[in-house]
Swiss-Prot record:
Pathway assignment: Carbohydrate biosynthesis; gluconeogenesis
Organism the protein comes from: Nitrosomonas europaea (strain ATCC 19718 / CIP 103999 / KCTC 2705 / NBRC 14298)
Binding-site residues, Mg(2+) 2: D114, D117, E281
Binding site for substrate: D117, G118, S119, S120, N209
The name this protein goes by in its record: Fructose-1,6-bisphosphatase class 1
Primary location recorded for the protein, binned into one broad class: cytoplasm
Subcellular localization, as worded in the UniProt entry: Cytoplasm
Pfam families, sorted: FBPase (PF00316), FBPase_C (PF18913)
Protein family (similarity comment): Belongs to the FBPase class 1 family.
Length: 334
């Protein structure tokens, strides 16, 4: 029997401190949470209900879609299109903005999401997740255009992710710190288990895909080489290297015990100087990391200050423990 604060209770308490709050945002967040519970169920059942494996289709990124990519995208849409809180949605799995169907009322928020981050891992039973970002619509109750979504990350109202692992967790921020909730399946509710999450300023862990080492720029080459040199090198201490190929899993580890995550600019594909998508990966995760006391940068500018030029724009990402990110920034500025 749980004795903690449920997510619903937590959000309502937060709402009471906001003058003029109408409950619209709370209702939207409840719809997102319902979608996340449904996705968690689909991911957990996996092969039992025949949803594992790949399709013969690609998304706008040119990536082969997993069955669960399509299923989870549909779950997010169907749970959030009908209630009148949104004027539009955008997803990693859709080329263009999703317009709210005409029978449904239009609202004052925009929802951007990656329905199943790390889906390449899903057949291997490695942790995957959902990432989402909520923005205000520039013109409430009007069908959203592409331009309406192209807002810098500093304008996010809320950002969060769900982690589908040994337990299902929801981590979110509304700009007043970061809190983590764990799904109690006995009562069907998320319960506050990780209040006021903070990233340690120092760390001895870094996460990067070392197979791309030959394509990195000099500042990242230098930083990683110094970490690998350990206690006999210029940093004077040993580091551990991690890589899960799931941004949600990487960021969750950093929130829990510190670390630095890097998917830096490289020359592997000149058309893609960055790999991660700004709107529905880098921005929401950067909002969370900064609210937890960490830093997030492209190596050249703060990610939350980047003005998007395209819905599926890619950027380099370096985020995590403050002091380590500052070392990488120092090398970029040298």
């Amino acid at each position: 029997m749980h004795t903690g604060t449920t997510l619903t209770q937590f959000i309502i308490e937060e709402q009471r401190h906001i003058a003029g709050a109408s409950g619209d945002f709370t209702a939207l967040l409840n719809d997102i949470v319902t979608a996340i519970k449904t996705i968690s169920n689909a991911v957990n059942k996996g092969a039992l209900i025949g949803v594992m494996g790949a399709l013969d289709t690609e998304n706008v990124q040119g990536e082969t879609q997993k069955k669960l990519d399509v299923i989870t995208n549909e779950i997010m849409i169907r749970n959030n299109e009908w209630a009148g809180h949104l004027s539009g949605m955008a997803s990693e799995e859709m080329d263009d903005v999703y317009s709210i169907p005409s029978p449904y009322p239009l609202g004052k928020y925009l929802l951007v999401f990656d329905p199943l981050d790390g889906s390449s891992n899903v057949d291997l039973n490695i942790s995957v997740g959902t990432i989402f970002s909520i923005l205000r619509s520039p013109v409430p109750s009007r069908a959203a255009s592409m331009e309406d979504f192209l807002q810098p990350g500093v304008k996010q109202v809320c950002a969060g992710y769900a982690l589908y692992g040994s337990s299902t967790m929801l981590v979110l921020t509304t700009g007043h710190g970061v809190n983590g909730f764990t799904l109690d399946r006995d009562i069907g509710e998320f319960v506050l288990t990780h209040p006021n999450m903070r990233i340690p300023a120092d760390t001895r862990e870094f996460a990067i895909n070392a197979s791309n080492q030959r394509f990195w720029e000099a500042p990242v080459q230098r930083y990683v080489a110094e970490c690998l040199a350990g206690s006999t090198g210029p940093r004077g201490r040993d580091f551990n290297m991690r890589w899960v190929a799931s941004m949600v899993a990487e960021v969750h580890r950093i929130l829990t015990r510190g670390g630095i995550f890097m998917y830096p600019r490289d020359t592997k594909d000149p058309s893609k100087p960055g790999r991660l998508r700004l709107m529905y990966e880098a921005n929401p995760m950067s909002f969370i990391v900064e609210q937890a006391g960490g830093l997030s940068t492209t190596g050249y500018e703060r990610i939350l200050d980047v003005v998007p030029q395209d819905l599926h724009q890619r950027v380099p990402v370096i985020l995590g423990s403050k002091n380590e990110v500052e070392v990488v920034l120092e090398y970029h500025n040298a």
